[in-house]
Amino acid sequence: MRCMLTAGALVLAGCSPAFATWSIMALDQKSGTIVVASAACVAPQDLAGVRAKDLMDIQAIVVPGKAVAVAQGSFDSTRETQKLMYTELVKGTDLEHILEMILRQDPGVGMRQVAMLAVEGRRAGFTGPATSVIAAHDQGQVGGTEIWYSVQGDNFPTDEVVPAAVQALTDHKEDLAERVMTAMEAIDAKGGDRRCSCASEPKPSTACETRTAHVAYMLRADKSDSNRESYNDGRYAMYLSVSGDHIKPNENPNPVKTLRMRYDEWKRTRPN
């Protein structure tokens, strides 16, 4: 399933500033493992302005062993969309019905981008007509596996970005998180968000060659993990977050590259 639209009339009600974001979700039906990763050209102080601790806090919806979703584009700062998605995903509501509920109830839906995956192999996605000039989503199954994926984003430099990410994820043969990390790198290599660069504010304090986002994260939830009170506040098997204002001198000012560094270190040091 693929969707690509051009920007249309803005729907302002309930919308935060239009942040450019890309994300990748994948789940393994056999193990129940879920992985979601994302990067955005949004400064940390702008996330604080919508009362978000980080990008994941306002974007990801995680139901361990069952479903995963993202709500992005112009983030719903009221979090009503995120709460609705989580409540219905927990209940096992049909994903297309959840999408219909969002389209009917969210006054800012024209600037939203939402996507959902359920462990049964169900998926649904929507890219609002006012998200950006180049915005797209693509969902499907990795051939010969029980892995399902969803790739989505806006403000891409070309329409080649999402297909490159899908190819990277489907061609890679390692575990689920490595597939997602490789797809994140494919988007980064294609230019990520076209508005971000080494010169965009806030500028990095160390030498910078390329930068396609200000923040990034990756989360892996195993079937045995659980949430506490909210839609993404659980104790998960892995959670790595990169913010431009907390990148170390020995790391890369490009959050996607630093996410790779931290992920590799996590793999190296985790118990077998």
Positions of predicted regions on the chain:
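N-terminal nucleophile
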Residues: F19-N272
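Bacterial N-terminal signal peptides
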Residues: M4-P17
